[in-house]
A protein has these predicted regions:
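Short, acidic, small-residue-rich periplasmic hinge/interaction motif at the N-terminus
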Residues: 32, 44-46, 77-81, 91-134, ...
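Short acidic/polar hinge/loop motifs at secondary-structure boundaries
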Residues: 65, 180-207
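N-terminal periplasmic accessory domains that precede
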Residues: 95-99, 141-144, 161-164, 176, ...
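Outer-membrane beta-barrel translocator/receptor signature
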Residues: 199-201, 212-283, 289-296, 304-307
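Flexible loop and strand-edge segments within Gram-negative outer membrane beta-barrel domains
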Residues: 276, 282, 287-289, 308-367, ...
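Outer membrane beta-barrel strand-and-loop segments of large Gram-negative receptors
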Residues: 403-418, 461, 573-582, 588-589, ...
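C-terminal beta-signal and adjacent terminal beta-strands/loops
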Residues: 554, 611-613, 617, 707-725, ...
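Gram-negative outer-membrane beta-barrel transporters
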Residues: 607-611, 615, 620-622, 628-716
Length: 800
C-alpha cells in the first residue's frame, strides 16, 4: 500500500514538473550599429538550439517565441560585419540590444586624416607599399623615399641618407615609426634616421603640416612608417629576404615571422643584418665607407574590436664608416680636396671600419591600449621610451686614439592619449593630449669641447582634428594644435666667444659660474607654438578631382641651432648656434589636380611655403684652432619662400607595357637678403618604361632614366683663405654646385611557387649602368669624392 502511494506521488511530481517546463517565454532583440546606434535591417540571427534562422526588421528588431528555461545560443551576422556569437539566459520574458561593427575588417592601427584608404584626400600624400619596400630591403629609409616625387635626400656619403620633403629636412620633418615619434638627435645633417625599413609594411609621406596629431612642427611634412597589419585569424606566416651586391661586396639579410589567433592575440619578430665593405666610385675605392648594421624588433598584443593592447620593442645598431678623405686636418686640406678630381686618400678594398666613423644604437619601447565606447568612439593611451647613444670618432693619437670625440646619450619619454568621436559616419573628431620629457647627457670625458650641452626638455601639446564628408564628392578636414616647449641647459662658453657674439649684452643673467677662461651658463627658454590646418577635396567627375590645403606650423629651435659651439669633428667644421634663435613660423598653401582613368593617371601638385625666422647654417669664414684652421658655419635666421611643383604621370600603353614619369622642381629664396637659399634640391625628372606579364611567373622588368639638373640657384658663400705653405691667398669655393648628370638603372623580378604556401621571388637590379662619374649637390662629401659607381644586386625573397 505504501509503495502504491509513493508511486502515485512520484507520477504527480513528474506531471507537475512537465507542466512547469512549458516553453512560453519570449525573447526580443534589437540589432544596432555600434558607432551611431542606428537600426540594422536584414541582420541574420541563427538560433543554434532550434536550428532556425530569422532576420531583423526595418527597425532592427526580432523576436523568438515559445522558449524554455535555459540558454539559447545565437549567431548574429550582417554584410560587412564580423559575426557575433552570444549566449542568452532565458528564465522569463527577456529583451536585449546587440551592436554590430560595420567596418571591423578595415580597422587600422593608426588613423590619420590623410591615408591611402581614404578615397577623398585633403592633403598631398603618397604611400609606398610592401613590394617597393622589400625591393629596397638592403637600403635605408632615405633611399626608398626617393621613389616619391618631391622627396629627395641630403647625404653624408651613401650610407647616411636623410629624407628631405620639398626642400626641408631634419627637425622640420617628423618621422613616426609604429605610432612613435622618433627621437634620435635628428637635428644633425649627418644623423640618419635609426629605422630598419624592413619593419614597415607601408610608408606614408604627408607633405606639409597637415597631420597635427603627430606634431605641430612638421614644416616639411611627416613620414609615417607603419608595421604589418594584424590578421585576426589562426595563422603563421613570414618572409626572408637575402640581398647581395657587388659595390661594397656586401649583403643584407632580413627575416620575419608572425603568429596570430582568431581570438585576436598576436606576436611577430623581425631581424635584419647588413655588412658592407668600402664602396666604389667609377674610378677608385671610397676608403673607409663600410657599414655594419643589425636590427631586431618584437611585437605582441591583443586586437579585438572593442579593446586591445600592443607592446613593441625595437633595437637598431649601426657602425658607419666616414670617407677617409673627408677628414681634413686644416683649411689647406679642404682647398686641396676641392681642387682635386679624385679622392685624396685611396687604399685597397677593406671591410675594416676605422676613424672617422659613427657608432649609433637606438632602442624603443612602446605600450599602448585602446578601448571603444558604444555610440561614442575610441580611447587610446600610449607610453613610449627611447634611448639613443651616439659616438662620433675622429682621427686621434695617443691615449685618446680610441675615445669618441662626441659621446651623446639621449633618453626620451612620451605619454599620449586621444579620443576619437566616430559615432557619426559623415563627421568624426579627434582630441588628444601629449606630454614628453627628454634628457641629453654629453659626456665631458671625451677630451674635446662638447658641441651639444647637457639639457632637459619638456613638451606639452593638445590638438583637435575634425573630418567632414560634405557629400558624395566633397570632403573638408581641419585641425588645430597648441604646444609649449621648455628647455633647460647647462653649457660652458669661452669668455672670448661669449663677448664676440655679444651675449654679454643680452644674456649675462644666465651666467652661474666663472671657470677662468670660461663661463658656465644656464639657458632656460620657453616657446609657445600654435599650429592649424584645413583641407578641402572635391571630385569633379569620375576622372577629375582637385585638392586644396593650408597649414600653419610653428617650430621651436632645436638644441643644435641654439647651443652649437665648437668643432664638429665628423663634419670637419666649426658650428656656432645662436641663443637668440626664435620659433620658425610656416604658412604653406598647396593645391593638387588629379586625372585618373583605366589607362592614364596624372597628378600635379603645387605648393608655396612662407617661413618666418627660417633657421639655416652656412659658412662665413675660418677660425684657427690648435688642430689648424677650419671653416666656420653659423646658424642664421631669415624670411624664406619656397615654392615648387611635383608631377606624376602613369600611362598604360598596352596590357603589358607601361610608362611612368616623376618630375620635381623647387625654388628657395632668402627674402630678407634677396638671394637664393642654400641646400635646395636641383630639378630632376625620372622616366621608367616597364613590362609585366603575370602569365610568366609574374614577370616584371623596368628600365629607369634619372636626370638631375645642375643647381644654378645658390648663395655665394665663397671667401679667401691664407695658405701658409705657399704664403698666398686662395679662394675657398664652397658654393659652386656640381654638373648635371644622368643615371640609367634596371631591375627585373619573377616569382615561382615553391610549395602550396611558399613563394620565391628572384630579383636582379643594376644601378648606374653606364658607370657614370657624378657628384650630387646635396651630398656633403661631394667636395672630396665622386658618388657611387655601377652596382649589381641579386635578391632572393621567400614568403611563407
Amino acid at each position: 500500500m505504501i509503495q502504491k502511494i509513493f508511486f502515485c506521488t512520484f507520477l504527480c511530481f513528474i506531471t507537475f514538473a512537465g507542466y512547469s517546463q512549458q516553453c512560453t517565454y519570449n525573447f526580443k532583440g534589437t540589432i544596432t550599429d555600434y558607432h551611431d546606434g542606428t537600426s540594422i535591417f536584414g541582420a541574420t540571427i541563427f538560433i543554434k538550439n532550434l536550428n532556425k534562422y530569422i532576420t531583423s526588421d526595418n527597425q532592427g528588431k526580432f523576436e523568438i517565441e515559445n522558449l524554455c528555461n535555459g540558454k539559447i545560443h545565437l549567431f548574429i551576422s550582417h554584410i560587412s560585419c564580423e559575426t557575433k556569437e552570444v549566449f542568452v539566459t532565458i528564465n522569463k520574458n527577456t529583451s536585449k540590444e546587440f551592436s554590430l561593427e560595420h567596418h571591423s575588417e578595415e580597422l587600422k592601427e593608426v588613423r590619420i586624416s590623410s591615408t591611402s584608404e581614404l578615397k577623398m584626400k585633403t592633403t598631398q600624400f603618397t604611400v609606398l607599399k610592401s613590394d617597393v619596400i622589400d625591393a629596397y630591403s638592403s637600403k635605408n629609409l632615405g633611399d626608398v623615399l626617393k621613389n616619391i616625387s618631391g622627396v629627395s635626400a641630403i647625404n653624408t656619403g651613401n650610407t647616411i641618407v636623410k629624407p628631405m620633403i620639398n626642400g626641408l629636412h631634419s627637425s622640420r620633418v617628423i618621422l613616426m615609426t609604429n605610432g612613435v615619434r622618433l627621437q634620435d638627435q635628428e637635428w644633425g645633417i649627418e644623423h640618419a634616421p635609426n629605422i630598419d625599413i624592413n619593419t614597415a609594411e607601408k610608408i606614408t609621406v604627408i607633405k606639409g603640416a597637415n597631420a597635427l596629431e603627430f606634431g605641430g612642427d612638421a614644416i616639411g611634412g611627416v613620414i609615417v612608417v607603419a608595421p604589418n597589419r594584424i590578421i585576426v585569424k589562426d595563422s603563421l606566416y613570414g618572409k626572408s629576404i637575402l640581398t647581395g651586391q657587388t659595390n661594397g661586396q656586401g649583403f643584407s639579410f632580413h627575416s620575419s615571422l608572425s603568429k596570430s589567433t582568431k581570438e585576436g592575440y598576436y606576436v611577430n619578430a623581425k631581424t635584419t643584418v647588413k655588412k658592407y665593405g668600402d664602396f666604389e666610385s667609377p674610378g677608385y675605392i671610397l676608403t673607409n665607407t663600410g657599414l655594419n648594421s643589425e636590427a631586431f624588433s618584437l611585437q605582441t598584443g591583443l586586437k579585438k574590436f572593442e579593446h586591445g593592447f600592443n607592446v613593441y620593442y625595437t633595437y637598431v645598431k649601426n657602425e658607419i664608416g666616414i670617407l677617409k678623405s673627408s677628414h681634413i686636418g686644416n683649411i689647406e686640406d679642404l682647398v686641396n680636396a676641392i681642387n682635386s678630381d679624385a679622392s685624396m686618400a685611396v687604399k685597397d678594398f677593406s671591410y675594416a671600419i676605422n676613424s672617422p666613423k659613427q657608432e649609433v644604437t637606438h632602442q624603443l619601447v612602446k605600450v599602448d591600449f585602446y578601448k571603444r565606447f558604444k555610440k561614442l568612439g575610441k580611447l587610446t593611451v600610449q607610453y613610449d621610451f627611447q634611448n639613443n647613444k651616439r659616438f662620433e670618432f675622429d682621427n686621434r693619437i695617443g691615449e685618446n686614439k680610441n675615445k669618441a670625440a662626441i659621446d651623446l646619450n639621449l633618453n626620451s619619454h612620451s605619454l599620449k592619449t586621444s579620443f576619437e568621436f566616430d559615432s557619426k559616419s559623415k563627421q568624426t573628431y579627434k582630441v588628444g593630449l601629449v606630454g614628453a620629457y627628454q634628457n641629453n647627457f654629453a659626456n665631458p670625458n671625451t677630451g674635446v669641447k662638447r658641441l651639444i650641452p647637457n639639457y632637459n626638455k619638456y613638451d606639452f601639446g593638445t590638438f583637435v582634428i575634425g573630418n567632414f564628408i560634405i557629400n558624395d564628392n566633397s570632403r573638408l578636414d581641419f585641425g588645430i594644435r597648441y604646444d609649449v616647449n621648455y628647455i633647460n641647459a647647462k653649457k660652458f662658453y669661452l669668455k672670448s666667444r661669449w663677448n664676440e657674439r655679444n651675449y654679454d649684452v643680452d644674456f649675462n643673467d644666465l651666467i652661474i659660474g666663472d671657470f677662468n677662461t670660461q663661463w658656465l651658463v644656464n639657458p632656460e627658454f620657453t616657446y609657445h607654438n600654435m599650429s592649424a590646418s584645413i583641407g578641402f577635396f572635391h571630385q569633379l567627375n569620375d576622372e577629375n578631382s582637385f585638392q586644396f590645403s593650408y597649414a600653419l606650423a610653428s617650430r621651436s629651435p632645436n638644441p643644435s641651432e641654439l647651443f652649437s659651439d665648437g668643432l664638429h669633428h665628423s663634419a670637419a667644421r666649426i658650428e656656432l648656434g645662436d641663443l637668440r634663435a626664435s620659433q620658425e613660423t610656416s604658412n604653406r598653401v598647396a593645391a593638387s589636380y588629379d586625372f585618373r582613368n583605366p589607362k592614364t593617371n596624372v597628378s600635379v601638385a603645387l605648393f608655396f611655403n612662407h617661413i618666418r625666422n627660417f633657421l639655416y647654417i652656412e659658412p662665413n669664414g675660418i677660425e684657427q684652432t690648435i688642430r689648424g684652421a677650419f671653416p666656420v658655419w653659423n646658424y642664421k635666421a631669415t624670411t624664406a619662400n619656397l615654392f615648387g611643383v611635383d608631377i606624376n604621370w602613369q600611362q598604360k600603353i598596352t596590357e603589358h607595357l607601361n610608362f611612368n614619369n616623376k618630375t620635381s622642381f623647387i625654388k628657395g629664396r632668402d627674402a630678407s637678403n634677396g638671394r637664393d637659399l642654400i641646400d635646395i634640391p636641383a630639378a630632376n625628372t625620372q622616366n621608367t618604361v616597364g613590362y609585366s606579364n603575370k602569365k610568366w611567373h609574374h614577370f616584371n622588368a623596368n628600365l629607369e632614366s634619372n636626370f638631375v639638373f645642375k643647381q644654378n640657384l645658390f648663395p655665394n658663400n665663397d671667401f679667401e683663405v691664407f695658405i701658409p705653405t705657399t704664403s698666398s691667398n686662395v679662394l675657398l669655393d664652397l658654393s659652386a654646385t656640381p654638373s648635371s648628370y644622368h643615371l640609367l638603372n634596371f631591375n627585373t623580378d619573377t616569382t615561382f611557387k615553391v610549395s602550396q604556401k611558399t613563394n620565391l621571388t628572384i630579383g636582379i637590379t643594376v644601378t648606374n649602368i653606364l658607370n657614370t662619374k657624378y657628384r650630387a649637390y646635396l651630398n656633403r662629401l661631394r667636395y672630396f669624392a665622386d658618388d657611387l659607381g655601377r652596382n649589381y644586386l641579386l635578391q632572393l625573397k621567400f614568403k611563407y
